[in-house]
Amino acid sequence: MSSAFDFEPQPRRASVAVDVGGVIVGGGAPVVVQSMTNTDTADIDATVAQVAALHKAGSELVRITVDRDESAAAVPKIRERLLRLGIDVPLVGDFHYIGHKLLADHPACAEALAKYRINPGNVGFKDKKDKQFAEIIEMAIRYDKPVRIGVNWGSLDQELLTRLMDANQANGSPLTAQQVMRETIVQSALLSAELAEELGLPRSRIILSAKVSGVQDLIAVYAMLAARSVHALHLGLTEAGMGTKGIVASSASLGILMQQGIGDTIRISLTPEPGGDRTREVQVAQELLQVMGFRQFIPVVAACPGCGRTTSTVFQELAQKIQEDIRASMPVWREKYPGVEALKVAVMGCIVNGPGESKHADIGISLPGTGEMPAAPVFIDGQKALTLRGPKIAEDFQLLVADYIEKRFGHGQAAAE
């Protein structure tokens, strides 16, 4: 085992840039956040509402299911409705089994979509496979659309898997079944991309993905793909699960890959709680990119975890309130206060780390812990600015944060500069 540990992120892997409806994926562009609806695409009202919500949350690409004629017919109407709302987010069509037929029968759908997602494992079977794959590629060429060749181990090409398993058995030093499965996933993606290029689709119109549900498997297959291709890569852990488990599994796998410079666009595939908010997956994707230092989307609120010194819940409530206000305000703030996403706010619960952490923030407050004087020093740009006292410390600090944002990022600051 090597004793060397490279703690810095590796340079981004060189990949071919792909233009997806005006959003650049790969080629050194910032890692793109995308999401997927779970509405019936034929339900235009519901799909428009969810796409709008995902876009507002920060999704830069939104994938929708196109599984039957009614869904395909709805796509151009959804696109038109979104544009009337001022929402120009690129829509990605998710096709399985009959994508070739739907694109041919619904040219308006083919035109309205910004990208087509193809699954090599179910695009067609036996002698129909290459023919139906070719038909989708021909449509992509006709309408000048990129495709994502998305392999998923739950629908893996069984013919290819069988062939590689048989070849492995004949090998004097056979691989494990897991290793053969990983190789099958990678070959399925690479062979499909090779065929697409032979059919005339340029490399600048191809994105690859290879999704599995195991963290170690995902890291392995993407490392293999990255080493054996220059295609832009879409990262995602499929069937990640619900709640904390899904967030941890996705963050662990995608975080490791991105630290190695691998990945051009990501989706956090969370199973929402019944009645849960679909935009949660967008928030998690943004937070992952932000905490790793790859992108900035929203001001950071640093808050201590609490301990026996902080029996009061005031600092927790204040931190939560500020975080909620920031997220709700960001759609307006992005336009009104350019650069505000770099802001750091600290809300600390006692004297131990409170003043120090607050000094490191742009604006911070150190609330009194158990047994401490009922006073809260506020630090602005590293200096103690004032001390808040009384029953409205939380409200007063929120006003100070709003005032700081206006002065630093508002028009007044721009004029002063």
From Swiss-Prot:
Entry-linked Gene3D superfamilies: Dihydropteroate synthase-like, Sulfite Reductase Hemoprotein, domain 1
Name of the molecule in the record: 4-hydroxy-3-methylbut-2-en-1-yl diphosphate synthase (flavodoxin)
Keyword Endoplasmic reticulum among UniProt keywords: no
Cofactor binding comment, as recorded: Binds 1 [4Fe-4S] cluster.
Coiled coil segments of this chain: none
Record-listed E.C. numbers: 1.17.7.3
Pathway: Isoprenoid biosynthesis; isopentenyl diphosphate biosynthesis via DXP pathway; isopentenyl diphosphate from 1-deoxy-D-xylulose 5-phosphate: step 5/6
PANTHER family: 4-HYDROXY-3-METHYLBUT-2-EN-1-YL DIPHOSPHATE SYNTHASE, 4-HYDROXY-3-METHYLBUT-2-EN-1-YL DIPHOSPHATE SYNTHASE (FERREDOXIN), CHLOROPLASTIC
Pfam (any one): GcpE
Function: Converts 2C-methyl-D-erythritol 2,4-cyclodiphosphate (ME-2,4cPP) into 1-hydroxy-2-methyl-2-(E)-butenyl 4-diphosphate.
InterPro entries with a match to the protein in the record: Dihydropteroate_synth-like_sf, IspG_bac, IspG_bac-typ, NO2/SO3_Rdtase_4Fe4S_sf
Gene name per UniProt: ispG
